[in-house]
Amino acid sequence: MFKKLFGQLQRIGKALMLPVAILPAAGILLAFGNAMHNEQLVEIAPWLKNDIIVMISSVMEAAGQVVFDNLPLLFAVGTALGLAGGDGVAALAALVGYLIMNATMGKVLHITIDDIFSYAKGAKELSQAAKEPAHALVLGIPTLQTGVFGGIIMGALAAWCYNKFYNITLPPFLGFFAGKRFVPIVTSVVAIATGVVLSFAWPPIQDGLNSLSNFLLNKNLTLTTFIFGIIERSLIPFGLHHIFYSPFWFEFGSYTNHAGELVRGDQRIWMAQLKDGVPFTAGAFTTGKYPFMMFGLPAAAFAIYKNARPERKKIVGGLMLSAGLTAFLTGITEPLEFSFLFVAPVLYGIHVLLAGTSFLVMHLLGVKIGMTFSGGFIDYILYGLLNWDRSHALLVIPVGIVYAIVYYFLFDFAIRKFKLKTPGREDEETEIRNSSVAKLPFDVLDAMGGKENIKHLDACITRLRVEVVDKSKVDVAGIKALGASGVLEVGNNMQAIFGPKSDQIKHDMAKIMSGEITKPSETTVTEEMSDEPVHVEALGTTDIYAPGVGQIIPLSEVPDQVFAGKMMGDGVGFIPEKGEIVAPFDGTVKTIFPTKHAIGLESESGVEVLIHIGIDTVKLNGEGFESLINVDEKVTQGQPLMKVNLAYLKAHAPSIVTPMIITNLENKELVIEDVQDADPGKLIMTVK
């Protein structure tokens, strides 16, 4: 029950990222447009008074503001797209449903435009009744004030309607309305019902949200910012932080702008105050990110590099430099945070506490900087330095330097004190047990706690998936010693990364548990040894080309811990734009998984590559895939290997991102080209 709910929350959290991703563009337009009206800047650059420049700046400001004014609609459309696999029909259904829901609430409660205008008049007079209005004018519709929550509710319902009815069959005389055309129709009916229910259910919910907002923001805002920072960072590993911060950014708090309109939410209030040119009172739930993202985490990356083994410093230095620079410039911290989250959780605990104090310190100092993307240098320039007199953004620099020092010394001390296995400090060698191919499944079964400890057994092309009865009986170190490159633990679910042989291990373990095969007896084998030297031909260089038309992304951005953590090997992520996967080099097909979602290839020089089409696509049981080749077949670079129904994958798989992994890199060097747009003729990697 909990795990199912957890999975649904993760999906919702990811869906919310789509509308949030629009905000940086809107924020840039609003910030630059507003800055061009800044009196101090106009004094320095009088040419900004030119009528054409004034018109351009006004258009930019208005273009940015209209996005923030209509966030609920964007959340409705974005949530539907995210939860329905990106299908445009779901977005259309959400748009129609959102309009109908608001119109229904307005009619049921007899809300008129006069009610809205009377509020606007009261807001200008700052009357008590005008501070927390229950009504709003949404796209010209007088209705209840449901904010972004209303958009999310309707978007989720539209996605549910799409997933439920997109392939519905109707009688022949209604055939035109079958399939996806039926989705907006049924969503309209659902929207009417939702509007009626919310007409009576939302007012008490609204009162509760207002009370919670007042309590958090007015009773002890200093403590609230500290707790907010801790919880927000703590939820990063689970992907639930988007759900947590959304009410703070888009609903909690209120401000009446110069037009008499009520603006809700910390981020939206900050943008409204930016446009109005008044002192900032918002930003308590955004400003705290700047010190630890721009200064703290890059310093932590340096501490990790400093403590790496000498022979691994070059590799670790490159990784940490890239991750630290990304955090500093853009505020994207996940590549750096995930580099130590699983191998050294104590460091992440330190990081979480420091993040909480960062929010607290920024609030105590009165620093108020908005953001639309994250707390990196780019947002710092746009929303901090351009408004330094109102935001007090210059204080971020000395505070950030202090945080850099604290992060560095705490990470350095913890790594050495607790002998943490951060990148570059892994054991030189892992003891590998001598287990033959025949004995391996027996040994893995023993390491999992034996037959009685196995509740469910499964596998995909990369990992053995086992649900156990008692996790304490599992010998994780023993599983790694048997050749697993990593073991993930989620509750009582164990995932052992054995690579392409995972499915065979599962198959043999199932037969062992059913009694079909028994443990082989120990046999001593004597081989005749030759005194003749063995000549090994150098493999040389292997060029690896794109497996289709699409986008290349770093492996660290693949939404799967096993691939992103390079447990299977190094490589890249590929986002296909056309439904055809082609051979990346001349070679041989070594493996085609029974569910067709993954292909193993070997080049003529012996380099082994795994192409895993999508994430968790093993669960599709072959639906959406059409294999064009056979095992042991010779293929040439660019030859089609698999036809893929991308629309089906987008609707039924968590992601279509396709990891492309070198599984036998070992002591060879992998050079990844600086490529984003790819096609079958473009070089993306070279193995030397």
Swiss-Prot record:
The active site is at 460 (phosphocysteine intermediate), 612 (tele-phosphohistidine intermediate). The chain crosses the membrane at residues 12-32, 81-101, 137-157, 182-202, 223-243, 284-304, 315-335, 340-360, 364-384, 395-415. Residues 560-664 form the PTS EIIA type-1 domain. PROSITE patterns: PTS_EIIA_TYPE_1, PTS_EIIA_TYPE_1_HIS, PTS_EIIB_TYPE_1, PTS_EIIB_TYPE_1_CYS, PTS_EIIC_TYPE_1. GO terms for molecular function: D-glucose transmembrane transporter activity; kinase activity; protein-N(PI)-phosphohistidine-sugar phosphotransferase activity; protein-phosphocysteine-sugar phosphotransferase activity. InterPro entries: Dup_hybrid_motif, Glu_permease_IIB, PTrfase_EIIB_Cys, PTS_EIIA_1_perm, PTS_EIIC, PTS_EIIC_1, PTS_Glucose_EIICBA, PTS_IIB_1. Its main location: membrane. It is an enzyme of class 2 (transferase). GO terms for biological process: D-glucose transmembrane transport; phosphoenolpyruvate-dependent sugar phosphotransferase system. It is a multi-pass membrane protein. Pfam families: PTS_EIIA_1 (PF00358), PTS_EIIB (PF00367), PTS_EIIC (PF02378). Residues 3-427 form the PTS EIIC type-1 domain. Signal peptide: none annotated. The EIIC domain forms the PTS system translocation channel and contains the specific substrate-binding site. The EIIB domain is phosphorylated by phospho-EIIA on a cysteinyl or histidyl residue, depending on the transported sugar. Then, it transfers the phosphoryl group to the sugar substrate concomitantly with the sugar uptake processed by the EIIC domain. PANTHER family: CYTOCHROME C-TYPE SYNTHESIS PROTEIN AND PTS TRANSMEMBRANE COMPONENT (PTHR30009), PTS SYSTEM GLUCOSE-SPECIFIC EIICB COMPONENT-RELATED (PTHR30009:SF20). This is PTS system glucoside-specific EIICBA component. It comes from Staphylococcus aureus (strain MRSA252).
